A protein has these predicted regions:
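Extracellular beta-rich repeat passengers
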Residues: 267, 275, 279-516, 521-539
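Proline-enriched interdomain boundary motifs that mark the N-terminal boundary
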Residues: 24-34, 130-138, 222
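Acidic Gly/Asp/Thr-rich repetitive segments characteristic of extracellular carbohydrate-active
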Residues: 219-262, 522-531
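Extracellular fibronectin type III
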Residues: 14-23, 98, 109-132, 193, ...
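Conserved aromatic anchor
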Residues: 41-52, 145-156
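Recognizes extended acidic, P/S/T-rich segments that occur
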Residues: 57-97, 161-192
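C-terminal motif of bacterial Sec signal peptides marking the signal peptidase cleavage site
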Residues: 6-10
Protein backbone atom coordinates (compact mmCIF):
# COMPACT_ATOMS: atom_id res chain seq x y z
CA UNK A 1 0.00 0.00 0.00
CA UNK A 2 2.80 2.37 0.79
CA UNK A 3 4.32 1.94 -2.64
CA UNK A 4 0.92 2.49 -4.22
CA UNK A 5 0.51 5.72 -2.28
CA UNK A 6 3.94 6.97 -3.33
CA UNK A 7 3.24 6.25 -6.99
CA UNK A 8 -0.03 8.14 -6.84
CA UNK A 9 1.42 11.22 -5.20
CA UNK A 10 4.97 11.29 -6.43
CA UNK A 11 4.36 14.19 -8.83
CA UNK A 12 2.53 16.27 -6.25
CA UNK A 13 4.73 19.20 -5.21
CA UNK A 14 3.05 19.21 -1.82
CA UNK A 15 4.65 15.92 -0.70
CA UNK A 16 7.98 15.61 1.08
CA UNK A 17 9.46 12.96 -1.18
CA UNK A 18 12.38 13.94 -3.41
CA UNK A 19 13.38 10.55 -4.77
CA UNK A 20 11.51 7.65 -6.35
CA UNK A 21 12.50 4.88 -3.95
CA UNK A 22 11.99 2.21 -6.57
CA UNK A 23 14.37 3.78 -9.08
CA UNK A 24 16.43 6.17 -6.94
CA UNK A 25 15.97 9.13 -9.28
CA UNK A 26 14.24 12.52 -9.36
CA UNK A 27 10.60 12.47 -10.30
CA UNK A 28 9.64 13.52 -13.81
CA UNK A 29 7.98 16.92 -14.23
CA UNK A 30 4.47 17.65 -15.42
CA UNK A 31 4.55 19.99 -18.43
CA UNK A 32 1.67 22.47 -18.40
CA UNK A 33 2.17 23.65 -21.97
CA UNK A 34 3.97 26.02 -24.33
CA UNK A 35 2.85 29.54 -25.24
CA UNK A 36 4.33 30.80 -28.55
CA UNK A 37 5.29 34.46 -28.23
CA UNK A 38 4.27 37.14 -30.74
CA UNK A 39 7.91 37.79 -31.60
CA UNK A 40 7.88 34.47 -33.47
CA UNK A 41 11.35 33.30 -32.39
CA UNK A 42 10.43 32.69 -28.75
CA UNK A 43 8.12 30.39 -26.81
CA UNK A 44 7.48 30.02 -23.08
CA UNK A 45 7.30 26.63 -21.36
CA UNK A 46 5.44 26.17 -18.09
CA UNK A 47 6.12 23.10 -15.96
CA UNK A 48 5.78 21.88 -12.39
CA UNK A 49 9.07 21.87 -10.54
CA UNK A 50 10.04 18.86 -8.42
CA UNK A 51 11.73 18.84 -5.04
CA UNK A 52 15.36 17.94 -5.04
CA UNK A 53 15.99 19.28 -8.53
CA UNK A 54 18.79 21.81 -8.77
CA UNK A 55 18.10 22.77 -12.38
CA UNK A 56 16.31 21.61 -15.52
CA UNK A 57 17.31 20.76 -19.09
CA UNK A 58 15.03 21.49 -22.03
CA UNK A 59 15.60 20.08 -25.49
CA UNK A 60 13.69 21.15 -28.60
CA UNK A 61 14.12 19.86 -32.12
CA UNK A 62 12.44 20.02 -35.50
CA UNK A 63 12.97 16.26 -35.56
CA UNK A 64 10.97 13.80 -33.47
CA UNK A 65 12.20 13.29 -29.90
CA UNK A 66 11.62 10.12 -27.88
CA UNK A 67 13.42 8.23 -25.12
CA UNK A 68 15.77 6.29 -27.40
CA UNK A 69 17.09 9.50 -28.97
CA UNK A 70 20.25 10.63 -27.20
CA UNK A 71 20.14 14.24 -26.01
CA UNK A 72 21.45 16.65 -28.62
CA UNK A 73 21.81 14.00 -31.30
CA UNK A 74 19.31 15.35 -33.86
CA UNK A 75 20.54 17.79 -36.49
CA UNK A 76 18.15 20.49 -35.28
CA UNK A 77 18.45 20.04 -31.50
CA UNK A 78 18.65 23.08 -29.24
CA UNK A 79 19.40 22.47 -25.55
CA UNK A 80 18.56 25.03 -22.88
CA UNK A 81 19.91 24.94 -19.32
CA UNK A 82 23.27 23.23 -19.73
CA UNK A 83 24.70 26.12 -17.72
CA UNK A 84 22.35 25.07 -14.87
CA UNK A 85 20.46 28.38 -15.18
CA UNK A 86 16.92 26.98 -15.46
CA UNK A 87 15.75 26.67 -11.88
CA UNK A 88 12.08 27.62 -12.03
CA UNK A 89 9.02 27.82 -14.26
CA UNK A 90 8.13 29.41 -16.62
CA UNK A 91 11.10 29.53 -18.97
CA UNK A 92 11.23 31.41 -22.28
CA UNK A 93 13.10 29.66 -25.08
CA UNK A 94 14.80 32.00 -27.55
CA UNK A 95 16.52 31.62 -30.90
CA UNK A 96 13.76 29.53 -32.45
CA UNK A 97 12.65 29.72 -36.05
CA UNK A 98 9.28 31.34 -36.62
CA UNK A 99 6.26 29.47 -37.94
CA UNK A 100 8.00 26.17 -37.19
CA UNK A 101 6.93 22.94 -35.49
CA UNK A 102 9.20 21.84 -32.61
CA UNK A 103 9.24 18.71 -30.49
CA UNK A 104 10.08 19.28 -26.82
CA UNK A 105 11.18 17.37 -23.76
CA UNK A 106 12.42 18.28 -20.26
CA UNK A 107 14.21 16.55 -17.41
CA UNK A 108 15.07 17.48 -13.81
CA UNK A 109 18.74 17.45 -12.80
CA UNK A 110 20.69 17.25 -9.52
CA UNK A 111 24.30 16.74 -8.55
CA UNK A 112 23.32 14.37 -5.74
CA UNK A 113 20.48 12.36 -7.24
CA UNK A 114 20.13 10.68 -10.62
CA UNK A 115 18.31 12.76 -13.22
CA UNK A 116 14.63 12.26 -13.91
CA UNK A 117 13.21 10.58 -16.96
CA UNK A 118 12.26 12.78 -19.89
CA UNK A 119 8.90 14.53 -19.72
CA UNK A 120 7.01 15.28 -22.94
CA UNK A 121 4.15 17.57 -23.95
CA UNK A 122 0.78 15.87 -24.21
CA UNK A 123 0.87 16.32 -27.99
CA UNK A 124 4.70 16.19 -28.09
CA UNK A 125 5.14 19.39 -30.10
CA UNK A 126 4.30 23.08 -30.44
CA UNK A 127 4.52 25.62 -33.27
CA UNK A 128 6.04 29.08 -33.07
CA UNK A 129 4.16 32.08 -34.35
CA UNK A 130 4.91 33.87 -37.58
CA UNK A 131 7.69 36.42 -37.24
CA UNK A 132 7.56 39.92 -38.67
CA UNK A 133 10.93 41.62 -39.11
CA UNK A 134 9.68 43.87 -41.92
CA UNK A 135 8.97 47.49 -41.06
CA UNK A 136 5.84 49.24 -42.34
CA UNK A 137 6.04 50.42 -45.94
CA UNK A 138 5.41 54.16 -46.24
CA UNK A 139 4.25 56.05 -49.30
CA UNK A 140 7.80 57.41 -49.61
CA UNK A 141 8.96 53.82 -50.23
CA UNK A 142 6.69 53.30 -53.25
CA UNK A 143 6.59 54.38 -56.88
CA UNK A 144 4.68 53.10 -59.91
CA UNK A 145 7.27 50.35 -60.50
CA UNK A 146 9.41 50.00 -57.37
CA UNK A 147 9.41 49.50 -53.62
CA UNK A 148 11.99 50.07 -50.89
CA UNK A 149 11.78 47.37 -48.23
CA UNK A 150 13.09 47.79 -44.68
CA UNK A 151 13.63 45.11 -42.03
CA UNK A 152 15.55 44.51 -38.82
CA UNK A 153 19.17 45.46 -39.46
CA UNK A 154 21.72 42.63 -39.19
CA UNK A 155 18.99 40.01 -38.96
CA UNK A 156 19.86 36.49 -40.09
CA UNK A 157 18.30 36.40 -43.57
CA UNK A 158 19.29 34.57 -46.74
CA UNK A 159 16.61 35.23 -49.36
CA UNK A 160 13.85 37.66 -50.34
CA UNK A 161 10.90 37.00 -52.64
CA UNK A 162 8.30 39.26 -54.26
CA UNK A 163 5.07 37.48 -55.13
CA UNK A 164 2.15 38.53 -57.30
CA UNK A 165 -0.64 36.34 -56.05
CA UNK A 166 0.98 32.91 -55.68
CA UNK A 167 3.58 33.50 -58.40
CA UNK A 168 7.12 34.47 -57.41
CA UNK A 169 8.10 37.43 -59.61
CA UNK A 170 11.41 38.46 -58.00
CA UNK A 171 13.98 36.47 -55.99
CA UNK A 172 16.97 38.11 -54.29
CA UNK A 173 19.81 36.03 -52.81
CA UNK A 174 20.94 37.87 -49.68
CA UNK A 175 23.71 35.50 -48.60
CA UNK A 176 26.41 37.67 -50.21
CA UNK A 177 24.61 41.02 -50.07
CA UNK A 178 26.30 42.33 -46.93
CA UNK A 179 25.10 45.90 -47.51
CA UNK A 180 21.42 44.90 -47.65
CA UNK A 181 21.68 42.61 -44.61
CA UNK A 182 23.68 45.09 -42.52
CA UNK A 183 21.36 48.02 -43.28
CA UNK A 184 18.16 45.99 -43.44
CA UNK A 185 16.99 47.56 -46.70
CA UNK A 186 16.78 46.84 -50.42
CA UNK A 187 15.14 48.44 -53.47
CA UNK A 188 13.13 46.27 -55.85
CA UNK A 189 12.59 47.68 -59.36
CA UNK A 190 10.72 46.50 -62.44
CA UNK A 191 7.31 46.06 -60.82
CA UNK A 192 3.95 46.70 -62.48
CA UNK A 193 1.96 49.84 -61.69
CA UNK A 194 -1.11 49.63 -59.43
CA UNK A 195 -0.45 45.98 -58.58
CA UNK A 196 -0.75 44.09 -55.30
CA UNK A 197 2.43 42.30 -54.21
CA UNK A 198 3.62 40.33 -51.20
CA UNK A 199 7.22 40.42 -49.95
CA UNK A 200 8.65 37.49 -47.97
CA UNK A 201 12.06 37.34 -46.32
CA UNK A 202 13.66 34.06 -45.27
CA UNK A 203 16.36 32.51 -43.15
CA UNK A 204 17.00 29.40 -45.24
CA UNK A 205 13.47 27.99 -45.65
CA UNK A 206 11.94 29.76 -42.65
CA UNK A 207 9.85 32.87 -43.27
CA UNK A 208 10.95 35.71 -40.98
CA UNK A 209 8.66 38.39 -42.38
CA UNK A 210 5.71 38.87 -44.70
CA UNK A 211 4.26 42.19 -45.85
CA UNK A 212 1.91 43.28 -48.60
CA UNK A 213 2.07 46.45 -50.67
CA UNK A 214 0.52 48.01 -53.76
CA UNK A 215 2.52 49.97 -56.28
CA UNK A 216 1.23 53.38 -57.25
CA UNK A 217 -1.01 53.88 -60.23
CA UNK A 218 0.27 55.51 -63.37
CA UNK A 219 -1.47 58.71 -64.47
CA UNK A 220 -4.56 57.49 -66.38
CA UNK A 221 -4.49 58.14 -70.11
CA UNK A 222 -7.11 60.45 -71.65
CA UNK A 223 -7.64 62.70 -74.65
CA UNK A 224 -6.17 65.44 -72.46
CA UNK A 225 -3.93 64.98 -69.42
CA UNK A 226 -3.63 68.24 -67.52
CA UNK A 227 -1.01 68.42 -64.78
CA UNK A 228 -1.91 71.01 -62.18
CA UNK A 229 0.88 72.99 -60.56
CA UNK A 230 1.21 73.33 -56.81
CA UNK A 231 -0.06 76.92 -56.88
CA UNK A 232 -3.22 76.17 -58.91
CA UNK A 233 -6.54 75.58 -57.16
CA UNK A 234 -9.48 73.58 -58.48
CA UNK A 235 -12.31 75.95 -59.50
CA UNK A 236 -14.92 76.45 -62.20
CA UNK A 237 -12.61 78.87 -64.00
CA UNK A 238 -9.74 76.37 -64.09
CA UNK A 239 -12.06 73.52 -65.08
CA UNK A 240 -13.47 75.56 -67.99
CA UNK A 241 -9.96 76.46 -69.12
CA UNK A 242 -8.85 72.81 -69.02
CA UNK A 243 -11.95 71.57 -70.83
CA UNK A 244 -11.50 74.13 -73.60
CA UNK A 245 -8.09 72.60 -74.38
CA UNK A 246 -9.52 69.11 -74.90
CA UNK A 247 -10.01 68.02 -78.51
CA UNK A 248 -11.74 64.82 -77.44
CA UNK A 249 -14.12 64.00 -74.60
CA UNK A 250 -11.96 62.52 -71.81
CA UNK A 251 -9.85 64.56 -69.38
CA UNK A 252 -7.46 63.52 -66.61
CA UNK A 253 -6.56 66.24 -64.12
CA UNK A 254 -3.38 65.18 -62.31
CA UNK A 255 -3.03 66.87 -58.93
CA UNK A 256 0.33 67.21 -57.13
CA UNK A 257 0.83 65.23 -53.94
CA UNK A 258 0.43 67.19 -50.73
CA UNK A 259 -1.66 70.02 -52.20
CA UNK A 260 -5.05 71.17 -50.90
CA UNK A 261 -7.86 72.45 -53.11
CA UNK A 262 -10.60 74.38 -51.31
CA UNK A 263 -13.44 75.92 -53.26
CA UNK A 264 -16.59 77.43 -51.76
CA UNK A 265 -18.90 77.01 -54.76
CA UNK A 266 -20.38 74.03 -56.59
CA UNK A 267 -17.91 72.68 -59.14
CA UNK A 268 -19.83 72.49 -62.44
CA UNK A 269 -18.76 69.71 -64.80
CA UNK A 270 -19.16 70.34 -68.51
CA UNK A 271 -21.80 68.36 -70.38
CA UNK A 272 -20.49 65.50 -72.53
CA UNK A 273 -17.03 65.16 -70.97
CA UNK A 274 -15.48 62.48 -68.77
CA UNK A 275 -13.31 63.65 -65.87
CA UNK A 276 -10.73 61.80 -63.78
CA UNK A 277 -9.30 63.65 -60.78
CA UNK A 278 -6.04 61.83 -60.12
CA UNK A 279 -3.66 62.29 -57.21
CA UNK A 280 0.00 61.96 -58.13
CA UNK A 281 1.82 59.59 -55.78
CA UNK A 282 3.66 61.09 -52.84
CA UNK A 283 3.79 61.18 -49.07
CA UNK A 284 0.29 62.71 -48.82
CA UNK A 285 -2.63 62.45 -51.17
CA UNK A 286 -3.85 65.74 -52.64
CA UNK A 287 -6.95 67.04 -50.87
CA UNK A 288 -10.17 68.06 -52.61
CA UNK A 289 -12.38 70.10 -50.27
CA UNK A 290 -15.00 71.70 -52.48
CA UNK A 291 -18.56 72.70 -51.63
CA UNK A 292 -20.14 70.08 -53.89
CA UNK A 293 -19.97 68.81 -57.49
CA UNK A 294 -22.77 69.22 -60.02
CA UNK A 295 -22.88 66.62 -62.78
CA UNK A 296 -24.20 66.88 -66.31
CA UNK A 297 -24.50 64.09 -68.87
CA UNK A 298 -21.04 62.65 -68.26
CA UNK A 299 -19.77 59.23 -69.27
CA UNK A 300 -17.37 59.07 -66.33
CA UNK A 301 -16.44 60.98 -63.22
CA UNK A 302 -13.63 59.36 -61.30
CA UNK A 303 -11.65 60.26 -58.20
CA UNK A 304 -8.43 58.29 -57.81
CA UNK A 305 -5.79 58.48 -55.08
CA UNK A 306 -7.15 61.69 -53.57
CA UNK A 307 -8.54 62.70 -50.19
CA UNK A 308 -12.06 64.08 -50.36
CA UNK A 309 -12.42 66.08 -47.17
CA UNK A 310 -15.41 67.94 -45.74
CA UNK A 311 -13.18 70.58 -44.15
CA UNK A 312 -14.00 73.29 -46.69
CA UNK A 313 -14.95 76.94 -47.08
CA UNK A 314 -18.03 78.89 -48.16
CA UNK A 315 -18.20 81.35 -51.05
CA UNK A 316 -16.80 84.11 -48.83
CA UNK A 317 -13.84 81.97 -47.81
CA UNK A 318 -15.04 81.27 -44.28
CA UNK A 319 -14.42 77.77 -42.94
CA UNK A 320 -17.35 75.35 -43.08
CA UNK A 321 -18.00 71.62 -43.02
CA UNK A 322 -19.31 70.36 -46.34
CA UNK A 323 -22.31 68.04 -46.37
CA UNK A 324 -21.98 66.14 -49.66
CA UNK A 325 -19.59 65.37 -52.48
CA UNK A 326 -22.43 65.05 -54.98
CA UNK A 327 -25.93 66.36 -54.15
CA UNK A 328 -27.62 66.25 -57.53
CA UNK A 329 -30.84 68.14 -58.22
CA UNK A 330 -30.47 68.97 -61.93
CA UNK A 331 -31.36 66.37 -64.56
CA UNK A 332 -28.38 64.24 -65.54
CA UNK A 333 -27.50 60.79 -66.80
CA UNK A 334 -24.04 59.61 -65.74
CA UNK A 335 -22.65 56.27 -66.86
CA UNK A 336 -20.05 55.76 -64.14
CA UNK A 337 -19.07 57.42 -60.85
CA UNK A 338 -15.97 55.81 -59.32
CA UNK A 339 -13.99 56.44 -56.15
CA UNK A 340 -10.72 54.48 -56.23
CA UNK A 341 -8.02 54.46 -53.54
CA UNK A 342 -9.60 57.51 -51.94
CA UNK A 343 -9.92 58.68 -48.35
CA UNK A 344 -13.37 60.21 -47.86
CA UNK A 345 -13.46 62.07 -44.58
CA UNK A 346 -15.98 63.90 -42.44
CA UNK A 347 -19.00 64.72 -44.64
CA UNK A 348 -22.16 65.58 -42.72
CA UNK A 349 -24.50 63.72 -45.03
CA UNK A 350 -24.18 61.53 -48.13
CA UNK A 351 -21.21 60.98 -50.37
CA UNK A 352 -23.58 60.76 -53.34
CA UNK A 353 -27.21 61.88 -53.08
CA UNK A 354 -29.91 62.06 -55.74
CA UNK A 355 -32.49 64.69 -54.79
CA UNK A 356 -36.16 64.78 -55.72
CA UNK A 357 -35.93 64.52 -59.50
CA UNK A 358 -36.88 61.49 -61.53
CA UNK A 359 -34.66 62.75 -64.38
CA UNK A 360 -31.45 61.76 -62.61
CA UNK A 361 -29.82 58.41 -63.28
CA UNK A 362 -26.41 57.23 -62.09
CA UNK A 363 -25.94 53.98 -63.97
CA UNK A 364 -22.96 52.72 -61.98
CA UNK A 365 -21.39 53.83 -58.68
CA UNK A 366 -18.18 52.15 -57.50
CA UNK A 367 -16.08 52.42 -54.35
CA UNK A 368 -12.81 50.51 -54.71
CA UNK A 369 -9.97 50.47 -52.19
CA UNK A 370 -11.33 53.43 -50.21
CA UNK A 371 -11.43 54.46 -46.56
CA UNK A 372 -14.66 56.24 -45.61
CA UNK A 373 -15.12 57.98 -42.26
CA UNK A 374 -18.23 59.93 -41.31
CA UNK A 375 -18.81 62.80 -38.91
CA UNK A 376 -19.19 62.04 -35.22
CA UNK A 377 -22.78 63.24 -35.28
CA UNK A 378 -26.11 61.94 -36.45
CA UNK A 379 -26.57 62.10 -40.23
CA UNK A 380 -29.83 62.47 -42.09
CA UNK A 381 -28.65 60.27 -44.94
CA UNK A 382 -26.92 57.10 -46.08
CA UNK A 383 -23.55 56.77 -47.84
CA UNK A 384 -25.53 56.56 -51.10
CA UNK A 385 -28.98 58.16 -50.89
CA UNK A 386 -31.73 58.33 -53.52
CA UNK A 387 -34.90 60.36 -53.03
CA UNK A 388 -36.46 60.10 -56.47
CA UNK A 389 -34.07 59.21 -59.29
CA UNK A 390 -32.30 55.94 -60.01
CA UNK A 391 -29.11 54.17 -59.09
CA UNK A 392 -28.07 51.33 -61.39
CA UNK A 393 -25.21 49.04 -60.39
CA UNK A 394 -23.67 49.72 -56.97
CA UNK A 395 -20.30 48.21 -56.02
CA UNK A 396 -18.41 48.44 -52.76
CA UNK A 397 -15.04 46.71 -53.20
CA UNK A 398 -12.11 46.37 -50.79
CA UNK A 399 -13.32 49.38 -48.82
CA UNK A 400 -13.36 50.27 -45.13
CA UNK A 401 -16.48 51.98 -43.80
CA UNK A 402 -15.84 53.69 -40.46
CA UNK A 403 -19.41 54.82 -40.42
CA UNK A 404 -20.02 56.88 -37.30
CA UNK A 405 -22.61 59.42 -38.45
CA UNK A 406 -23.97 57.57 -41.47
CA UNK A 407 -27.38 55.91 -41.24
CA UNK A 408 -26.36 53.01 -43.46
CA UNK A 409 -24.73 52.02 -46.73
CA UNK A 410 -27.54 52.52 -49.23
CA UNK A 411 -31.02 54.07 -49.37
CA UNK A 412 -33.44 54.27 -52.28
CA UNK A 413 -36.92 55.65 -51.68
CA UNK A 414 -39.28 53.09 -53.23
CA UNK A 415 -37.05 52.84 -56.31
CA UNK A 416 -35.30 49.74 -57.61
CA UNK A 417 -31.63 49.65 -58.47
CA UNK A 418 -29.96 47.11 -60.74
CA UNK A 419 -27.64 45.39 -58.25
CA UNK A 420 -25.66 45.84 -55.04
CA UNK A 421 -22.35 44.01 -54.73
CA UNK A 422 -20.23 44.22 -51.56
CA UNK A 423 -16.88 42.41 -51.71
CA UNK A 424 -13.82 42.40 -49.40
CA UNK A 425 -15.14 45.16 -47.12
CA UNK A 426 -14.76 46.04 -43.45
CA UNK A 427 -17.98 47.72 -42.27
CA UNK A 428 -17.98 49.26 -38.80
CA UNK A 429 -20.56 51.10 -36.72
CA UNK A 430 -23.65 50.98 -38.91
CA UNK A 431 -26.57 51.10 -39.04
CA UNK A 432 -27.65 54.03 -36.90
CA UNK A 433 -30.45 53.75 -34.36
CA UNK A 434 -33.68 52.69 -36.05
CA UNK A 435 -32.01 52.50 -39.47
CA UNK A 436 -30.97 49.79 -41.93
CA UNK A 437 -27.73 48.59 -43.49
CA UNK A 438 -29.53 48.73 -46.85
CA UNK A 439 -33.00 50.24 -47.22
CA UNK A 440 -35.47 50.51 -50.11
CA UNK A 441 -38.11 51.98 -47.73
CA UNK A 442 -40.37 48.97 -48.27
CA UNK A 443 -40.20 45.34 -49.27
CA UNK A 444 -41.83 46.16 -52.62
CA UNK A 445 -38.54 47.33 -54.13
CA UNK A 446 -34.95 46.20 -54.24
CA UNK A 447 -31.97 45.33 -56.40
CA UNK A 448 -33.41 43.51 -59.39
CA UNK A 449 -30.26 41.41 -59.87
CA UNK A 450 -29.87 40.80 -56.16
CA UNK A 451 -27.72 41.86 -53.23
CA UNK A 452 -24.45 39.93 -53.22
CA UNK A 453 -22.01 40.16 -50.29
CA UNK A 454 -18.69 38.27 -50.20
CA UNK A 455 -15.62 38.19 -47.92
CA UNK A 456 -16.96 40.97 -45.71
CA UNK A 457 -17.00 41.79 -41.99
CA UNK A 458 -19.84 43.64 -40.24
CA UNK A 459 -18.66 44.89 -36.85
CA UNK A 460 -20.66 46.84 -34.25
CA UNK A 461 -23.84 48.86 -34.69
CA UNK A 462 -24.51 52.35 -33.37
CA UNK A 463 -27.47 51.21 -31.24
CA UNK A 464 -27.81 47.52 -30.41
CA UNK A 465 -31.43 48.02 -29.36
CA UNK A 466 -32.63 49.40 -32.70
CA UNK A 467 -30.48 48.30 -35.64
CA UNK A 468 -31.92 46.63 -38.71
CA UNK A 469 -30.54 44.68 -41.63
CA UNK A 470 -31.89 44.86 -45.19
CA UNK A 471 -35.34 46.13 -46.18
CA UNK A 472 -36.02 45.09 -49.78
CA UNK A 473 -37.47 42.34 -51.94
CA UNK A 474 -34.01 41.37 -53.19
CA UNK A 475 -32.50 37.91 -53.18
CA UNK A 476 -29.53 38.01 -50.79
CA UNK A 477 -26.51 35.88 -51.69
CA UNK A 478 -23.71 35.80 -49.10
CA UNK A 479 -20.37 34.01 -49.05
CA UNK A 480 -17.75 34.27 -46.29
CA UNK A 481 -19.64 37.02 -44.46
CA UNK A 482 -18.84 37.56 -40.78
CA UNK A 483 -20.35 39.49 -37.89
CA UNK A 484 -18.97 40.37 -34.47
CA UNK A 485 -21.16 39.86 -31.41
CA UNK A 486 -21.62 43.63 -31.01
CA UNK A 487 -23.22 43.71 -34.46
CA UNK A 488 -26.79 42.94 -33.39
CA UNK A 489 -29.84 43.41 -35.59
CA UNK A 490 -33.30 43.73 -34.08
CA UNK A 491 -35.21 43.39 -37.36
CA UNK A 492 -34.91 42.69 -41.09
CA UNK A 493 -32.23 40.10 -40.44
CA UNK A 494 -29.84 39.15 -43.23
CA UNK A 495 -31.26 36.21 -45.18
CA UNK A 496 -27.86 35.30 -46.61
CA UNK A 497 -25.56 32.96 -44.70
CA UNK A 498 -23.54 34.70 -41.97
CA UNK A 499 -20.85 33.33 -39.65
CA UNK A 500 -20.65 34.82 -36.16
CA UNK A 501 -17.27 35.62 -34.60
CA UNK A 502 -17.30 34.91 -30.87
CA UNK A 503 -16.04 38.31 -29.79
CA UNK A 504 -16.62 42.03 -30.09
CA UNK A 505 -15.13 44.43 -32.60
CA UNK A 506 -12.43 45.30 -30.05
CA UNK A 507 -11.61 41.60 -29.71
CA UNK A 508 -11.24 41.31 -33.47
CA UNK A 509 -9.52 44.58 -34.44
CA UNK A 510 -6.48 46.38 -33.02
CA UNK A 511 -8.21 49.72 -32.30
CA UNK A 512 -11.44 50.22 -34.22
CA UNK A 513 -12.43 53.38 -32.36
CA UNK A 514 -9.26 55.00 -33.71
CA UNK A 515 -9.72 53.64 -37.24
CA UNK A 516 -7.29 50.71 -36.95
CA UNK A 517 -9.09 47.62 -38.22
CA UNK A 518 -6.04 45.36 -38.36
CA UNK A 519 -7.24 41.85 -37.51
CA UNK A 520 -5.53 40.65 -34.34
CA UNK A 521 -7.45 37.52 -33.35
CA UNK A 522 -6.05 34.16 -34.44
CA UNK A 523 -9.42 32.69 -33.45
CA UNK A 524 -11.12 34.54 -36.31
CA UNK A 525 -11.82 32.13 -39.15
CA UNK A 526 -11.80 34.90 -41.75
CA UNK A 527 -8.45 36.40 -40.74
CA UNK A 528 -6.87 35.54 -44.11
CA UNK A 529 -9.75 36.22 -46.49
CA UNK A 530 -12.39 38.53 -44.99
CA UNK A 531 -12.61 42.29 -44.65
CA UNK A 532 -10.70 44.96 -46.54
CA UNK A 533 -7.45 43.44 -47.75
CA UNK A 534 -5.10 45.89 -46.00
CA UNK A 535 -6.31 44.76 -42.55
CA UNK A 536 -6.04 40.99 -43.02
CA UNK A 537 -3.47 38.62 -41.59
CA UNK A 538 -1.10 37.11 -44.14
CA UNK A 539 -0.83 33.67 -42.54
Amino acid sequence: MLLTTIAATSCDNANDWTVDAAHNRLFSCDLSGVTPEDIGTEATLEFKTVKGAEYYLIEVSKDTLYNDIEMGSTATSIIYGEDKSIKESPYTMTGLDSSTKYYLRLKAMSGNTPESKWSYLSDYSFKTKSEQIFEEISTADLTENSVVLHWLANAEVTKLEILKGEEVKVTKDLTNDNEAVTNGTITIDGLEAQTNYTAKIYKDNVVRGTIGFTTFAAVPSADLVYRMTADENLSNELLAEITAQCEGTSITIAMPAGTTNKYGEALELVDGYSYTFFGIAGEKKPVIAISTITLKNNALIKFQNVELNADGINAEGTAKTNEYIINQSAAAVVDNITFEDCDIIGFKNSIVRIQSSSSIEFKKVVFNGCYIKGQNLASKYYVLHNNSGKFGEVEYNNTTFDCTGYRGLFYSENKDCTSINITDCTIYNIPASGQYVIDFKSTNNGATNGIIINNTIFAKVQDASAAKGIRSNSVQTFDNVWTTNDFKLTGNQFSGTVTAFDGTSTDLFENPAAGDFTIKSYNFGGRLNAGAIKWRMTE
